[in-house]
Amino acid sequence: MASILELRSRIKSVNSTKKITKAQELIATSRITKAQSRVAAAKPYAEEITKVLSELASASASLDHPLLNERTDPKRAAVLVVTSDRGMCGGYNSNVLKEAEELFQLLRSEGKDPVIYVLGSKGLGYYTFRGRDLGGAWTGFSQDPGYSDAAKASRHLVDLFMAGSGSEVPAPNGEGTIEGVDELHIVYTRFVSMLTQSPEVRRMAPLEVMVSEERVELGEDMLSNGHGSSDSEPVAGYNFEPEPDKLLGALLPKYISTRIYSSLLDAAASESAARRTAMKAATDNANELVNTLSRQANQARQAQITQEISEIVGGANALASSAGSD
């Protein structure tokens, strides 16, 4: 058994660590509330742009737009993988990276070459360590993403898609060029509840379109991620100026930016929830370890006291025997 001093030193060390994990748990809890508020604040705009685009598509003479049309022979697919900038969030990053690897395998099986784009330092480190080629990376805002951050990534990805495979566009870092793609996908973590976060794959482009007798709706929109219904309510007819075809071309890139922004907000809430769960588990484990070490320290102290008493009694008996013999 370890000495009492060693046990007390370990107890002190574990208590210090417990203070850190408890503080991280409280911070993550407060950030979840903030992230959920931002998701709710972004929802009205997401709903309205979806409705307006559905009306535009219904009023348009044709749906002939690159962001809506399937490519005849897709060869390259850009995949945006959303990870965190910081660690201590349990399996948050490993789960989304695993989902991304499964998507890469699926794309390769379909004859498409995946081009990896990363949001978050953890994903960047993961692929860099393994020597994987990256189309681009954006870091520093995983916990507090802004619309400008989403728009920055979206602009490059939309340009990449509009160019198509076989054409070149400037690289996001401004150094050289990169070949265009025929599909856009995003892999992120959807916030379900404080205890459940689910890695998800969404195709950003070409956008899926559902055509009915009365109207045209965008399929698998960003409202299907748990923050609203994908069933659009009927809205009053619009008079569009300029022509619906021109407006459709102008708004579709903004729609993709909104979908990416919605995914980033979801991922931020999921990251904080995963970190809260991980830090709570670490704090609970620290409490259990402190209790175990305290019991061991008490047992060691009791054994030490018992030994000291035995030595004193033994010494007293020896002195008494010596005095009696005299």
Swiss-Prot record:
InterPro entries named in the record: ATP_synth_F1_ATPase_gsu, ATP_synth_F1_gsu, ATP_synth_F1_gsu_CS
Keyword annotations: ATP synthesis, Cell membrane, CF(1), Hydrogen ion transport, Ion transport, Membrane, Transport
Topology in membrane: Peripheral membrane protein
A GO molecular-function annotation: proton-transporting ATP synthase activity, rotational mechanism
Keyword flag Cell membrane: yes
GO cellular-component term (any): plasma membrane
Entry's family note: Belongs to the ATPase gamma chain family.
Function noted in UniProt: Produces ATP from ADP in the presence of a proton gradient across the membrane. The gamma chain is believed to be important in regulating ATPase activity and the flow of protons through the CF(0) complex.
Subunit structure as annotated in this protein's UniProt entry: F-type ATPases have 2 components, CF(1) - the catalytic core - and CF(0) - the membrane proton channel. CF(1) has five subunits: alpha(3), beta(3), gamma(1), delta(1), epsilon(1). CF(0) has three main subunits: a, b and c.
Name of the featured protein: ATP synthase gamma chain
Annotated organism of origin: Rhodococcus jostii (strain RHA1)
Source taxonomy: Bacteria, Bacillati, Actinomycetota, Actinomycetes, Mycobacteriales
